[in-house]
């Protein structure tokens, strides 16, 4: 059986569809036996996303919370099929972990070809660590 040691795709109350504080999430992660937790709130392209300044300020968070490594990141929105994201690379480069995802609020659905070209463009961005959904 594979043991999960971290969850790096989580949202705090900053992403308004989520309901937990950072402390609540860390407590749950400890109960699950995790060694790390990632905070990856939605970028500003989502209706409930954080403003860009939220991600700028993440360096002010501790690197550890309650014995867990705190991975500071973002789930950015893919804005077009050329790989444009809703946060600038100057902000992304300050983060530990960046997920890039398609969300219907940030981009209209299109063909499989268009979406594939978008994914291929996104993976060329050195500040993106993970493809989301």
Question: PLM features: what roles do these ranges have?
Answer:
Residues 2:
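Catalytic phosphate/metal-binding cores of nucleic-acid and nucleotide-processing enzymes, i.e., regions
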Residues 5-15, 39-42, 131-132:
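Histidine-centered catalytic micro-motifs
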Residues 8, 12-27, 56:
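N-terminal pre-domain/capping segments
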Residues 28-29, 62:
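Short secondary-structure boundary/capping segments within folded domains
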Residues 30-33, 123-124:
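Non-catalytic positions within long, well-ordered alpha-helices that form the structural scaffold/packing
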Residues 35-39, 71:
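Short, well-structured secondary-structure segments
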Residues 43, 48-133:
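Extended substrate/RNA-proximal surfaces in nucleic-acid metabolism proteins
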């Amino acid at each position: 059986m594979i043991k999960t040691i971290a969850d790096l795709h989580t949202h705090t109350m900053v992403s308004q569809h989520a309901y937990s504080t950072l402390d609540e999430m860390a407590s749950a992660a400890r109960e699950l036996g995790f060694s790390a937790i990632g905070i990856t709130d939605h970028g500003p392209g989502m209706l409930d996303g954080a403003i860009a300044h939220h991600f700028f300020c993440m360096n002010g968070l501790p690197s550890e919370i309650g014995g867990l490594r705190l991975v500071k990141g973002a789930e950015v929105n893919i804005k077009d099929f050329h790989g444009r994201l809703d946060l600038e690379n100057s902000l992304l480069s300050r983060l530990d972990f960046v997920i890039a995802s398609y969300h219907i609020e940030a981009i209209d659905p299109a063909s499989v070809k268009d979406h594939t070209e978008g994914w291929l463009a996104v993976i060329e961005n050195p500040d993106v660590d993970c493809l989301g959904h």
